[in-house]
């Protein structure tokens, strides 16, 4: 009887165990769960071994055979790695782990899931290369690996997948050439990478609707074959590369917006505003460009009589010197041709000069009503230039030149100015060059003739890197008209002089400006390492996200920003538009704050003048240019001024309601940037609100929140890391009164040195 009872109990337990055993797909997902280190939202809490299958788990869907079809956990704040075991889910068709914090490489065996149709791992921290095994996913329809840290070359077999229609790989570090193919792709975004080489001629097909390869290092000409198979309504963005030559005369390219070709100084033709030079156009050329002989002379044999000129349609059967032209006739033809060419040259030169004289005379007549027709040099040390200094500037008439300057040299100089992007047509009259540092050596002609390279552009201005003949380098912003008028110059000049007096190691130095009839230039020191939105430092658009900067450099950047803002506030100024694109990095990665003072010029809004000549200089309405539009292309000497539009995510909430800027606005922007430096990702408003509840006991939580790339450097420094997080959240508090001052914020950061774990005591309290 006892044996029978034991047998019944044994079989009962066996049946229970067999009925509750988790299937193979569930076991694979449990391995995935074990690879997740942080799950702050407890989304994986329902995943356990008690179920027969994972079909009831959060983020999982199955087929009728309890096999996993979908794994979807986007925006879940998960931290971990992608396990190779996911490749064992042989029926998996859709995988979405976007906008999390998964890191590490993509395992090769991960691509054994051959049924995958949708793969989205965007906005993570995945590194390494894309394995060539991705070419085995023949059913793949959509691939989104954007906003990661992937590098290496793009697999050639990726472009050959016959079902792939959507490919998004932007904001990574891919290099090498773009493989040819992509015949069935409809959406292809490879922007903001390090791709070089040339565009392949066999690229895309009739299905293509969107192509973006902007902000790369692609060089060479645009192959004419590249648009043959494109539909006419396709969008093609080739901006900010190193492309050269003419844009193919194809409806595909002619239908594009001109800004889709900007940032390529070597490109010419429609739809850009840079026409291609036509060698046969009637113009006066320099002696170096003139062939050694005229066409008539070039057609004559080198030795008279050795190869006589004959009728090309006749057969030369009996060469006879007497059938050719006599030497006297030949000499007469040559002399006549030379005389004719000389007469034509004189006529063209006369017409050219007359037209230029007429333009200059008209301009001078208009300008005499308001100002003198000399170019004045002003400095802070003297309100007006001496006569000797004024004589150093020449009137820009087409007929006026130095004695040693030839007409061809004049034209070469004009061509250089046009290629540099500067307009030299209006350089007389009420033009004014103002230098704010006493540099009397800088002349407007010297600046306008400098070698210039386009660094970036916005709707209101273009930024150039200007290299003078003596080797000095400046950042020159050419401002658009945007309603700028001469009558505003009287208000602008004292304003820009006040801005020029703000000299600090963590501020971009304003060297001067030029106010002309058709040219408004603002001159800065050139800052070589670009801004925090440079692809070398950032991960994704719109955020600093400096994933590849060590903790020591990040702390240095935070301290420098705090010092610069504290100085501005001490001088009774407000920046009002602080964001990563306005944080520039010098040779030693010392930050320099830019974009203070230009809003006054562009908008003409009333500034709030205080005692001592200081002023409030910004409006609250901002338009934030994206990293793809500007600054991601490399060194950005000065950020773009903002025009009226949408608010920046770095603007304080109260700036929506108030037109008068406050130092608390800058504190808010600093707090958001500090949190991005700490976490290595964009910080949402919800996270800022939740983070304000950090307590002293949350040291381990602060470590988990920190960027994975710097956690090793912060070992044993949890207390200071927690203080940094609390400072960032306090600065970004939605309540202005709870934000510390920049002086207090700087005091917190100065307590810690990156190479030391000693933290000095501080009397600063958060949330006061």
From Swiss-Prot:
Superkingdom per UniProt: Eukaryota
Query: LRR repeat boundaries?
Result: 67-90, 91-112, 115-137, 139-162, 163-183, 184-206, 207-229, 232-254
Residues annotated as carrying Phosphothreonine in the record are 553
> What's the Enzyme Commission number for this chain?
2.7.11.1
Q: How does it sit in the membrane?
A: Single-pass type I membrane protein
Principal location listed in the UniProt entry: membrane
Q: Which residues cross the membrane?
A: 329-349
A GO CC annotation given for this chain: membrane
Protein name (database record): Probable LRR receptor-like serine/threonine-protein kinase At4g37250
Q: Which species does this protein come from?
A: Arabidopsis thaliana
């Amino acid at each position: 009887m006892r044996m029978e009872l034991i047998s019944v109990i044994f079989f009962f337990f066996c049946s229970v165990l067999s009925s509750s055993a988790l299937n193979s797909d569930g076991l694979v997902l449990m391995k995935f769960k074990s690879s997740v280190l942080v799950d702050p939202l407890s989304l994986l809490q329902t995943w356990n071994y008690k179920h027969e299958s994972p079909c009831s788990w959060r983020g999982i869907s199955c087929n009728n055979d309890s096999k996993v079809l979908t794994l979807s956990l986007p925006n879940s704040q998960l931290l971990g790695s992608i396990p190779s075991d996911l490749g064992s889910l042989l029926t998996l068709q859709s995988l979405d782990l976007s906008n999390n914090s998964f890191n590490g490489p993509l395992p090769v065996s991960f691509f054994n899931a051959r049924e995958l149709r949708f793969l989205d791992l965007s906005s993570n921290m995945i590194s390494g290369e894309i394995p060539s095994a991705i070419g085995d996913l023949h059913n793949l329809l959509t691939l989104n690996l954007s906003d990661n840290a992937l590098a290496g070359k793009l697999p050639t077999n990726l472009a050959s997948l016959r079902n792939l229609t959507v490919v998004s790989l932007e904001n990574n570090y891919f290099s090498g050439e773009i493989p040819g193919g992509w015949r069935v792709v409809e959406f292809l975004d490879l922007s903001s990478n390090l791709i070089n080489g040339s565009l392949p001629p066999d690229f895309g097909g009739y299905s293509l609707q969107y192509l973006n390869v902007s902000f790369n290092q692609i060089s060479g000409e645009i192959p004419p074959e590249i648009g043959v198979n494109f539909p006419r309504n396709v969008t093609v963005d080739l901006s900010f590369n190193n492309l050269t030559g003419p844009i193919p005369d194809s409806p595909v390219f002619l239908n594009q917006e001109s800004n889709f070709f900007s940032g390529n100084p070597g490109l010419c033709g429609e739809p850009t505003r840079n026409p291609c030079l036509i060698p046969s156009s009637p113009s006066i050329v320099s002696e170096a460009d003139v062939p050694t002989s005229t066409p008539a002379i070039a057609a004559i044999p080198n030795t008279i009589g050795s190869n006589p000129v004959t009728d090309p349609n006749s057969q030369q059967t009996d060469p006879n010197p007497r059938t050719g032209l006599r030497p006297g006739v030949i000499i007469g033809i040559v002399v006549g041709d030379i005389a004719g060419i000389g007469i034509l040259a004189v006529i063209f030169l006369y017409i050219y000069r007359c037209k230029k004289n007429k333009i200059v005379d008209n301009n001078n007549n208009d300008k005499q009503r308001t100002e003198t027709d000399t170019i004045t040099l002003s400095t802070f040390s003297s309100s007006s230039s001496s006569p000797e200094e004024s004589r150093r500037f020449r009137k820009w008439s087409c007929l006026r030149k130095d004695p040693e300057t030839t007409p061809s040299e004049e034209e070469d100089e004009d061509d250089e100015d046009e290629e540099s992007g500067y307009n030299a047509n209006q350089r007389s009259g009420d033009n004014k060059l103002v230098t704010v540092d006493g540099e009397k050596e800088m002349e407007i002609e010297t600046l306008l003739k400098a070698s210039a390279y386009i660094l970036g552009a916005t709707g209101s201005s273009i930024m150039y890197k200007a290299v003078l003949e003596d080797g000095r380098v400046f950042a020159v912003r050419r401002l658009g008209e945007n309603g700028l008028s001469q009558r505003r110059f009287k208000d602008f000049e004292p304003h820009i002089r006040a801005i020029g007096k703000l000299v600090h190691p963590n501020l971009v130095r304003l060297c001067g400006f030029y106010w002309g009839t058709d040219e408004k230039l603002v001159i800065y020191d050139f800052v070589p390492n670009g801004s925090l939105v440079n692809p070398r430092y950032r991960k994704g658009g719109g955020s600093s996200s400096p994933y590849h900067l060590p903790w020591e450099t990040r702390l240095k950047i935070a301290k420098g920003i705090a010092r610069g803002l504290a100085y501005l506030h001490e001088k009774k100024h407000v920046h009002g538009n602080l964001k990563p694109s306005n944080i520039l990095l010098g040779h030693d990665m010392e930050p320099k704050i830019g974009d203070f003072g230009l809003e006054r010029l562009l908008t003409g809004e009333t500034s709030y003048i205080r005692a001592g000549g200081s002023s409030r200089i910004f409006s609250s309405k901002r338009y934030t240019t994206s990293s793809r539009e500007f600054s991601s292309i490399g060194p950005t000497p000065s950020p773009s001024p903002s025009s009226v539009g949408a608010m920046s995510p770095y603007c304080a909430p109260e700036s929506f309601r108030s037109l008068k800027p406050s130092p608390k606005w800058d504190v808010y922007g600093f707090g958001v940037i500090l949190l991005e430096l700490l976490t290595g990702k964009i910080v949402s408003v919800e996270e800022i609100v939740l983070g304000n509840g950090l307590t002293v006991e949350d040291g381990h939580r602060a470590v988990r929140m920190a960027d994975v790339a710097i956690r090793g450097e912060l070992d044993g420094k949890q207390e200071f890391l927690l203080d940094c997080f609390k400072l960032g959240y306090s600065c970004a508090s939605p309540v202005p009164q709870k934000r510390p001052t920049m002086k207090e914020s700087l005091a917190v950061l100065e307590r810690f040195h990156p190479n030391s774990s000693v933290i000095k005591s501080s009397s600063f309290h958060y949330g006061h």
